[in-house]
């Protein structure tokens, strides 16, 4: 299986961009803060996982992981090997398959990857006009023709030599075996890709296309599925100097796609427009970006692997971004619900910097089995909210992390500030402030008040003075006065706002019928809310209202003179009113 992984490393990473990417990523990234022994164990574990995926691709054509995710994990693996000072993987295939390799007549150079529009514009400066082509997501190859006859089909490999795939070429209709009007010695470089119908990269990603091609080409048998493979020629070393002439000649020789999908760029604005075109519109192949190239290229004998100044790539926005889980945090909401939030290595997704993601309940966290050190993929859900898509690799050495005891947190817990109640109590204050329509009183404001023990129950803020608030670190007189003003205004808010704010259930259904605390108690005692609430809802409401802590809150609000809680002006409810 390890040998299979080595071969896949050799072939699947035949994309011309990879060599440059690996060098840059390894020199820019920091090595993991692990011991060498642990780093070696985790590296071996990741290699085994990659080998498993490759085995499925080769033997069954099953894609368990998207190509762009595979690439990111392979980059991580290569980086760890770099940290371990291990030999580059590109040397391995020659040792493993010495009898099945061929030297490229012209080296595959690879491409530098530019990150954004600003870098693209800098590269374009002084070079326009240039040409743009889609960066086909497939397997790079060299085709060698002598006197019009195909004599070699070679995988990119390490750029200097690759695997001999000539025998497979006869089963791929898009590869001409003979060309009548070819020059005596013809060397072409291009991409084997999987034919698609109406493929939208933005929606579907690469859909395992590249690995599917690699799997078909590596099989010992000649599968009928080889006819699904297409060929896009993206380079003709030592061909016609003018691109338009080169493209027409390629089409005449049986390679029409380059002519159809090449665009002359005279203004920088065209680049972004075409990049999004290939990302969003239906195509007959998967793409992972666009390639820009100058019209004038060096002679083929000057091409070197990892060295290319006349062409660059700009990849598509990632649909799935791989990142490392740094920590697992448990948040407790005002009702006692425990949620799990993962702290992440910061990543950029659709121009957003993401460093945390909410994955929901403790139960789902256990199902996902995600811990610090694991690699996860992120996507953006509706309204740009980050979403965990998948745990793609789990670290071998697992931490033992225990969530808070759910028995301690519920609808009536943490109504006062006690040890272990900080999160839920602050969430209750935030909810109360929002329902009382306080502006400028943030979660941070409440946290400062509770940290200094100025507020230890849901009504404690009613008695605060502006001077007490101003004494908090970093508040200042102006902000303290603004907060105090909001507290003062809140005292005059309607009864229904207060009821919802302190957490009384189902107030949306009762606000038209209940306008005083004593009235609610009396209606519950007389079972006069059956028309508005179900049996279960009535029990939940009754349990809440009859709780000693809630009664204490109502009493404090009464003392503070809050409308609807004041007992001096309490109402006497007659039977007719109770029946409403």
UniProtKB/Swiss-Prot annotation:
It holds the Pfam family DNA_ligase_OB. Its EC number is 6.5.1.2. Belongs to the NAD-dependent DNA ligase family. LigB subfamily. Catalyzes the formation of phosphodiester linkages between 5'-phosphoryl and 3'-hydroxyl groups in double-stranded DNA using NAD as a coenzyme and as the energy source for the reaction. It comes from Photorhabdus laumondii subsp. laumondii (strain DSM 15139 / CIP 105565 / TT01) (Photorhabdus luminescens subsp. laumondii). SMART domains: LIGANc (SM00532). One of its GO terms (biological process) is DNA replication. One of its GO terms (molecular function) is DNA ligase (NAD+) activity. Keywords: DNA damage, DNA repair, DNA replication, Ligase, NAD. It is an enzyme of class 6 (ligase). InterPro entries: DNA_ligase_B (IPR020923), DNAligase_adenylation (IPR013839), DNAligase_N (IPR013840), NA-bd_OB-fold (IPR012340), NAD_dep_DNA_ligaseB (IPR050326), NAD_DNA_ligase_OB (IPR004150), RuvA_2-like (IPR010994). The gene is ligB. The active site is at residue 135. It catalyses: NAD(+) + (deoxyribonucleotide)n-3'-hydroxyl + 5'-phospho-(deoxyribonucleotide)m = (deoxyribonucleotide)n+m + AMP + beta-nicotinamide D-nucleotide. This is DNA ligase B.
